[in-house]
Amino acid sequence: MSAVTSLSESAVPAGSGESALGDLSNPASASRRAKDRTATIAMHSAFVLALVPLVWILWTVISHGYRMLLTSQWWMNSQRGVTVRDFGGGAYHAIIGTLLQAGVTAVISVPIGILTAIYLVEYGRGVAARAVSFMVDVLTGIPSIVAALTVYALWISTFGLSRVGFAVSLALVLLMVPTIVRSTEEMLKLVPNELREASYALGVPKWKTIMRIVLPTAFSGILTGVLLGLARVMGETAPLLILGPYTKSINFDLFSGNMASLPTMINQDRTEFLDAAVQRTWGAALTLILVVMLLNLAGRLIARFGKV
């Protein structure tokens, strides 16, 4: 019995409780806690610093432009017949132009982007896949003005066509496609390979597996990427200023005549230092922010509640 007692006493380190308490109060532990607090404070400070300019911009635009948005005239009328000195008029023509250009951009970009992502994930191997991936990376990093000048050189200088709404959409396509490709590519990679293998085991062809299994599984993530890409291109200004001359009238034809948009409306009225033009500038800016925010919110909600 005494032997067992001596063994148990020897198994328990002397002063183990004191050493545990000592670890909490020794300089090394205190230094770690201090570093942790410092890192936490630094992260919160960085968040606040990033939030301050955003809140300031939103507050400035909202406080100056909300009055215009409270009138039905703003949503139902254009600026036709309204001079820079006149109060009134609306942004209906610019909203229609923005939505039309963005819609055509999406119609062209979504199939190209999704098919490219499918190729890279499901079929792409070797040099060809690496070349396509490299070109997508290049397009991701190009400034919007480069895309606008590229379309200008081909559409206007080479083919002699006019500056119309469709030319704007082509420039926006160059900016939207890489966003869709990368977001869709990541969503397709998240689809478990077990689903593909089970489909192949049942004798389903690869193309039908992609159409019936892979794409429906990743649909919510793909749609989120499309909406976020669309929100990005709707806020671009360089293609609109270079390729889309402004008009105060409503134009539904993307292939003929000038077409207004919210960015070009802002640019048109900002050059005037009259109260009426300044109010319209703030109103158009707030309208554009609301449209982009709604698209971003829709994308976030789909990403949160959808299934991948």
Please state what every model-predicted region is.
Residues G22-S45, W59-T105, R125, M265-Q279:
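Periplasmic/extracellular loop-to-transmembrane helix junction in inner-membrane transport proteins
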